[in-house]
Amino acid sequence: IGFLESYLHGGITTSISASEVHVPGRPSDPDGVVALAVAAKKSFDNYSPGGMHVHAGAIILEPGLTQKHFNEAARQGVWLAKAGFGKFKSPYDYKPYVKMAQKAGMIVNVHTGGASIPDSSPITGDHLLHMQPDVSFHINGGPVAMPDADFPRIINESKIALQICQAGNIRTALMCLDMAIEADEFDRLIFATDTPTGTGVMPLGMIKTVVEMACLSKHSPEMMIAAATGNNANVYKLNTGFLKRGRAADVILADAPLGSSATTALDAIKHGDYPAIAAAFTDGVPRYVGRSRNT
């Protein structure tokens, strides 16, 4: 309880649901799946923890859903769908459901890597290329990664967005980062946390990902910040992620942390230190100024 506000103190101004899969007694029948997504979407339309923007309500792809179900969910504002948690015999069976969700105007995210909940299956590169979703969730593993040989295939044989997550495999995260940039596909790289999960609740999960990808690679902190902000905004079609007239006034102020050998936030990130977050604004409103609870 209260973890989203704590994430705001970790510099995260927007959260996107990976579906409400852990709701106790979660329904898996088609009508129940739609009802859960709509309820989550409308609840967070009315609730902004600490001022954070929360895009909740992702329809969980389950057998029996029809185009009518997706259209009704979309009519009520649901624009996210999630594959990987349904009771399908094979991940290949997701394809028609992915297409129905996309036809309804939804962005489809797909669990990638080893199975994470009972009744689900590992999802590999073959499955992703068959489904053609919009986003490969935690492509570096959530937390178990798909085979290394699948990464260049996803990068070179599709336009699927590549989500690197904190709660995954750091070796494959760095490998995917290098491969995507070398293939001139940086715009498809997005950062996320994939938390809370069994890995834990990580208010600093996003900034930790930015720091690790910058300090353990040859790439600049500016690029890693772009993967966490503007690239996410472009992939999910959000009015955030850029300092530009007409965009949402969601901004954090950061500096080198007390005691760091670095003198700027960017230098601290490249050095491997978490920057100090001094203030956060959403919708132009200061949510805290002076010091974050978590940095």
State each model region's role.
Residues D178-P257:
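His/Asp/Glu-enriched, well-ordered alpha-helical/loop segment
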Residues A249-T295:
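C-terminal cap of metal-dependent C-N hydrolases
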Residues V78-G200, S217:
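Active-site core of metal-dependent hydrolases
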Residues I1-G2, G32-A39, K95-K99, S121-G125, ...:
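Charged helix-capping and loop-helix junction motifs
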Residues I1-M52, L61-Q76:
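Alpha-helical scaffold segments that flank or form the walls of functional sites
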Residues I12-T13, Y47-V54, Q76-V78, A104, ...:
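Short coil/turn connectors at secondary-structure junctions
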